[in-house]
Amino acid sequence: MSMTKRGILAGLIPACLAAAVLAGAGPAPQKQKTALFVWGGWAGHEPKKCVDIFAPWLESQGFKVEVSDTLEAYLDAAKLKSLDLIVQVWTQGTITPDEERNLEEAVKSGVGLAGWHGGLADSFRSNVEYEFMVGGQWVAHPGGIIDYDVDIVKPGDPIVKGLKRRFHMKSEQYYMQVDPGVEVLATTTFSGQYAPWIKGVVMPVVWKKHYGKGRVFYSSLGHVASDFDVPEARETVQRGMLWAAHVIE
């Protein structure tokens, strides 16, 4: 065999071996999704109990989950932007300018944000940019704990698809100021029994929206942890978190 042929073969062997290794490796493994739960604020909304419902569930879906009981979790801007999802469960209270800015910039950059009831839409009443991000703010719950119905209005959306078109709640019926630009998935109608001037008002209950590149999901259900014993209330939050994290479209 000539030296030229030997040189060609010598060059082909490692190339073929490399190709075989790459072919056997298969597709590169997908990066594990990451989520941060931040809970605290008013204890009456049972934030820890609610987190204990949804954090383990997200782990069962393959997420790496971190739980924090301080808003100081928002001080690490780089870490926030590395996440796939932030779930905030924090009613009332105050947030520092740095914490707020880092949270908002993370969502604008593409990190998902999800939450429910006062934990997301009655958090920081003096922070209008935060409210702009969420898409709404609680203002009243006439009658307190009452019986009311929730109607699915976009039954084809993946977050609510297959759920009962109307389901019952015994909880606070949130009256809210809502951004008209949100995409409403479920509503409730006020009877006027406790505030006659709002009789017949149709109020958004579940919505989704964007803030910059980030997806934002909200449900007004979930005054206390036992509210999530209602399958539809629990399922909408579960799917909403997945949507915000780009797991479902």
Question: Which ranges hold each PLM region?
Answer:
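A glycine-rich, often tryptophan-bearing local segment used as a flexible ligand/cofactor-contacting loop or short
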Residues: 93-162
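Bacterial Sec-dependent signal peptides at the C-terminal "C-region" and cleavage site
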Residues: 18-32
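Structural detector of well-ordered beta-strand residues that form the stable sheet scaffold
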Residues: 112-114, 185, 217
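Extracellular ligand-binding/catalytic regions of CAZymes and related secreted enzymes
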Residues: 28-37, 60-63, 78, 192-203, ...
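Helical hinge/lid and interdomain linker segments adjacent to catalytic or ligand-binding clefts
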Residues: 2, 37-38, 42-122
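Short, solvent-exposed loop/turn segments at secondary-structure junctions
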Residues: 43, 93, 120-121, 189-192, ...
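Catalytic beta-strand/loop cores that center a nucleophilic Ser/Cys/Thr
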Residues: 58-59, 82, 136-212
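N-terminal export leaders
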Residues: 5-10
